[in-house]
Amino acid sequence: MSFASEFKAFALKGNVVDLAVGVIIGAAFGKIVDSIVNDLVMPVVGAIFGGLDFKDYFVALKEIPPGVPHALDAVKKAGVPVFAYGSFLTIVLNFLILAFIIFLMVKQFNRMKRAEPAPAPAAPPEQVVLLREIRDALRR
């Protein structure tokens, strides 16, 4: 079997194709969740915490030079090291929302999945059947 035919057999297996479709749909779904977090949830959280964009919450690890605005991008451009906890919290919230939605989807999928009936017990081998018949005949 040639290398190309082995690769073709591997790539066209159901699991690989299913995984590829899942990754593509997951990437598109991730963009939707990013939009929900960044455009809908975080502005509300920012309004609760004083109207500042939540992504701009940071702690400067060195003194900010005079004349540099107190905004994350400006401080980073000035070369000041920062602890950008607002951006981190946004990403954590994004992950939690995505994980919760995936949990709900898996839970619904498991609910819709029909319970497979238990497989019928395997028939005993012919030798066992013959030995049982002999045993039953001797008991009579």
Swiss-Prot record:
HAMAP family: MscL
Bilayer topology term: Multi-pass membrane protein
Keywords: Cell inner membrane, Cell membrane, Ion channel, Ion transport, Membrane, Transmembrane, Transmembrane helix, Transport
InterPro entries in the record: Mechanosensitive_channel_CS, MS_channel, MSC/AndL, MscL_channel
Function recorded in the entry: Channel that opens in response to stretch forces in the membrane lipid bilayer. May participate in the regulation of osmotic pressure changes within the cell.
GO cellular component, one term: plasma membrane
Pfam families: MscL (PF01741)
Top-level taxon of origin: Bacteria
Subunit structure: Homopentamer.
UniProt keyword annotation of Heme present: no
Gene Ontology MF term list: mechanosensitive monoatomic ion channel activity
PANTHER family cross-referenced by the UniProt entry: LARGE-CONDUCTANCE MECHANOSENSITIVE CHANNEL (PTHR30266:SF2), MECHANOSENSITIVE CHANNEL MSCL (PTHR30266)
UniProt subcellular location: Cell inner membrane
Record-annotated membrane-spanning stretches: 16-36, 86-106
Gene encoding the protein: mscL
Protein name: Large-conductance mechanosensitive channel
PROSITE patterns linked: MSCL
Family: Belongs to the MscL family.
